[in-house]
Amino acid sequence: MMTFVSTITNAQTSKLLMNDAKSYIGKIDDKAKMNVGFYSVFLDKDSPETYKVNGYSDVEGTKADFSGTIIFNSEKTKNSKDESKIYDLKFSEKGTGKHNGIFSGELSIRESSDKNQLKFEGTWTNYGNTMKFPFYFNN
């Protein structure tokens, strides 16, 4: 049986998520280019497994601010085949337009001596439930 031991602390996780103030790059619906960045990331003092985030998504020039949570999932982390730390995420975009909605999915952080790898993936659903697309972005 393999046991995962993380060397990343909560403070380091917040810093990692900020990504040196650079945006993450990815795609939505496997075709539209997307940039995602965080304005702030902080540990919830009442729930030490939860990070509160504020940020933005930019899909081909259409920008939307969001707020949300990233929550450490110990069960998924324990079962991770590549020893990644797994978090559940939910980001709610501000606005009520057809192209505003919720990102829900997972963040995996894989430790490396060179550069820690952060990968976000899941599904974006608009508030009217008329559009639903897979997304991913990473550092």
Model-derived segments and their meaning:
Residues M1-K15:
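Bacterial Sec-dependent N-terminal signal peptides
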Residues T13-N139:
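Central antiparallel beta-sheet cores of small beta-barrel/beta-sandwich binding domains
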